[in-house]
């Protein structure tokens, strides 16, 4: 069993190190890693990209296992073997393990994104001799802006939740008022049927039962009147304004000057443009390599065709030689017979 696992792992390691695996996997990572950030929050786009990566890896592995003759059970047993969990092999098999482990996949994509950004910055520095001003300032203002916006959103959600709870209390109080009214009406009808002469007692009991309900309903009625006067957009603006006042945070976008905003935009556009140039150069180099391989294949095919033609000509020469031999032998026999 151990020897089978070692053989399967050796085959998979050789395949993972080859160009059939590395070229499509690296190309996928370079094109899809730009949206991955080193944050705790997982975006919805991460899941879609992970599913696409699963399909790619499963297709490549299935083709290799079918060519080598390894079954799916043997591959699973080899992955579960202790040898596959060693530190060295685990690092090499990281792209394969990322299919089932989303944390490994995210860390791998974040690392590739950082590598491409550093590569783009290095190329900029080599061309210009120095980095531009938009890439030299220290603190990242964008992350601070995102944190402040998240605080505002969470505060607005908290206020909307409180408003929703107040609305629910108002509705429950209204329902209780209706039930008490119906209950008092039934009591009045029952009392009038039993004692028609005594008509003052049900009215007094009805007033006594309605008094505490009216006291509870008054604050909710005021709140509901305010809610009716305000539209949905005004209510949302009021919640955000209240959140800013309570948290002591003003809008982060308004805190920035026009020069800082333009500098942030220049920085993002500059990096994006350099990144696209780098990817375009890589694509051109891959196309050139592919074209050279196609030319080599055509050359080898032409050589094979030439060798086949030579074989045919040799075969014809042999047939002619055989015919000449037969004619010579027949001539000699006829001469001896005469």
Swiss-Prot record:
Positions of region (Disordered): 175-220, 281-314
Main location (coarse class): nucleus
InterPro entries registered for this protein in UniProt: BART_dom, BART_sf, CFAP36
Disulfide bond annotation, renumbered to this chain: none
Keywords from the UniProt entry: Cell projection, Cilium, Coiled coil, Cytoplasm, Flagellum, Nucleus
GO cellular component, one term: axoneme
Gene3D superfamilies, per database record: ADP-ribosylation factor-like 2-binding protein, domain
Comp. bias (Polar residues): 187-202
Pfam families: ARL2_Bind_BART
Compartments it resides in: Nucleus; Cytoplasm; Cell projection, Cilium, Flagellum
Family named by the database record: Belongs to the CFAP36 family.
Protein name: Cilia- and flagella-associated protein 36
Gene source species: Xenopus laevis (African clawed frog)
């Amino acid at each position: 069993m151990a020897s089978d696992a070692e053989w399967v792992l050796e085959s998979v390691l050789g395949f993972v190190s080859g160009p059939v695996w590395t070229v499509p996997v690296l190309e996928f990572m370079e094109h899809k890693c730009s949206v991955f950030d080193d944050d705790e929050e997982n975006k919805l786009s991460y899941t879609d990209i992970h599913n696409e990566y699963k399909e790619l890896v499963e297709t490549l592995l299935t083709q290799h296992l079918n060519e080598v003759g390894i079954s799916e059970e043997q591959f699973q047993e080899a992955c579960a073997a202790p040898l596959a969990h060693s530190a060295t092999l685990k690092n090499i098999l990281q792209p394969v393990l990322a299919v089932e482990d989303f944390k490994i996949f995210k860390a791998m994509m974040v690392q590739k994104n950082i590598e491409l950004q550093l590569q783009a910055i290095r190329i900029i520095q080599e061309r210009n001799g120095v980095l531009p001003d938009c890439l030299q300032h220290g603190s990242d203002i964008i992350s601070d802006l995102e944190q402040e916006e998240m605080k505002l959103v969470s505060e607005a959600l908290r206020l909307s939740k409180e408003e929703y709870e107040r609305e629910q209390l108002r509705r429950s109080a209204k329902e209780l008022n209706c039930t008490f009214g119906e209950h008092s009406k039934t009591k009045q009808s029952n009392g009038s049927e039993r004692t028609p002469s005594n008509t003052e007692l049900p009215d007094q009991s009805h007033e006594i039962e309605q008094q505490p309900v009216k006291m509870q309903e008054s604050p909710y009625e005021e709140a509901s009147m305010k809610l009716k006067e305000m539209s949905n957009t005004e209510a949302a603006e009021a919640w955000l304004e209240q959140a800013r006042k309570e948290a002591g945070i003003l809008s982060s976008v308004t805190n920035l000057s026009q020069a800082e905003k333009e500098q942030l935009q220049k920085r993002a556009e500059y990096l994006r443009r350099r990144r696209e140039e780098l990817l375009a150069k890589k694509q051109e180099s891959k196309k050139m390599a592919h074209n050279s391989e196609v030319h080599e294949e055509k050359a080898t095919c032409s050589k094979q065709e030439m060798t086949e033609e030579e074989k045919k000509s040799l075969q014809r020469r042999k047939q002619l030689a055989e015919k000449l031999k037969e004619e010579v032998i027949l001539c000699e026999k006829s001469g001896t017979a005469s």
